[in-house]
């Protein structure tokens, strides 16, 4: 439960910052992939950011923890983040 709250707060901070309230499409798809995609698909998604290997490895390590959450809860988090992003885009 704590991880989902942290993820939600981080997304709110990134998506709804006053200087730029429009959610970047790449960020939205990355967060959705982080929560719902399988490891190979998510790793491919991360490749477009050209992040250092250490950063990718760290992200994949956190994804292991997220993947232990029930799929239904991850879908619920994704839907909630979608609603938040929708409000930020207005």
Swiss-Prot record:
Signal peptide positions (record): 1-21
Keywords: Secreted, Signal
SUPFAM superfamilies: Uteroglobin-like (SSF48201)
Location in or out of the cell: Secreted
Keyword Zinc-finger included in the entry's annotation: no
GO-annotated cellular components: extracellular space
Expressing tissues: Expressed in lachrymal gland, thymus, kidney, testis, ovary and salivary gland.
Subunit structure: Heterodimer of a lipophilin A and a lipophilin C (mammaglobin B) monomer associated head to head.
Family: Belongs to the secretoglobin family. Lipophilin subfamily.
Function recorded in the entry: May bind androgens and other steroids, may also bind estramustine, a chemotherapeutic agent used for prostate cancer. May be under transcriptional regulation of steroid hormones.
PANTHER family assigned: SECRETOGLOBIN FAMILY 1D, SECRETOGLOBIN FAMILY 1D MEMBER 1
Protein name (record): Secretoglobin family 1D member 1
Species in which this protein is naturally found: Homo sapiens (Human)
Gene: SCGB1D1
């Amino acid at each position: 439960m704590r991880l989902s709250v942290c993820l939600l707060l981080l997304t709110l901070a990134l998506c709804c910052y006053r200087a730029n309230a429009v959610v970047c499409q790449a960020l939205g798809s990355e967060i959705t992939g982080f929560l719902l995609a399988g490891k190979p698909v998510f790793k491919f998604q991360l490749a477009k950011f050209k992040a250092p290997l250490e950063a990718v490895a760290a992200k994949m390590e956190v994804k292991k923890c997220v993947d232990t959450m029930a799929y239904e809860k991850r879908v619920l988090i994704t839907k909630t983040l979608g609603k938040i992003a929708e409000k930020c885009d207005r």
